[in-house]
Structure formats: C-alpha cells, structure tokens
C-alpha cells in the first residue's frame, strides 16, 4: 500500500475522466510531491495509541454533505470525497481487489472488473441454453439503497477474517 508504484497506479486510475478538473491538473503538475504527500499521509495514519512520526500528516476524513443524483432511472445519495480522499480510496481498492475477488462467489456480478452486466447476461444465457428443464424465466434483483444498509461492524469483521493487518483495517 505504501509503495510508490501502488500510489502512482491508484492516481492513474483516479484521474481517468477527470483530467479537466483543477485539482487533477495541479497534481499532474506536481506529481512527485503529491505522491510523497500521499505516502506520508498513509504512513502517519495509525490506530489510536500507535506512535507516528508526524500525526498532523495523517489522514482525517472530511465531513461530507450528501448529494442527490439521478442515474439510470434511480435516485442515489452520494458523498463526494476530496481528491486526496479519492486517491486513498483508489489505493485501498488496489490492495483489496485481489483479496476480495479471490474469495468471492464466481457469479457475483456488477462490482467486479470484467464481471459487469454483459458477463451476467452471458452466464444466464449459457445456463438457459444448457437447461434440460427448459427454463425460460429468471429473476433479476436489485436491493434498493443496499449500501446505506450495510452494517459497518459486520463488514469490518468480515474483512478482518481475510486481512490480518490492523493498520490497514484502520485505514479502511
């Protein structure tokens, strides 16, 4: 998580589609300094009671005001993080992705790379073609406002089963 390569790759992922934003232009112009800033921020973000070299540099989440957006016929409540917070999210995802993907059900779709709607559609079509009973219907389910209902304590307990690094769990 602290490697320069991971921090730079996360930024490369973050900036896709955002290259006109002022903060992205600034980071592009000062990339080496900003990568070091992210490194120092992560290094100085530790659980309470753990000594750090410079606690003022540690990550402190901002208070966000929810924003309502209309997307794909749905109303969504989102929280827009500041650019460095987004960058940290991308770093966390880079580290978590192989852990989560490796233990997920192989037909979980939607939130995994290369397992979107087209992947799900192809799987269902394959099952329907090879079904000896001649099934012609299936049910597509979307849990309304699912992310709002996730219990953080349960999520963190499940992550702790797969991740033994207390510091990384704290950053999450």
Model-predicted segments: where are they?
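Reverse-transcriptase-like RNA-dependent polymerase core
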Residues: 7, 41-74, 87, 170-172
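Non-catalytic, polymerase-adjacent accessory regions of viral genome-replication enzymes
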Residues: 1-44
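Short acidic (Asp/Glu) patches
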Residues: 74, 114-127
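Conserved polymerase palm-domain catalytic core
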Residues: 127-172
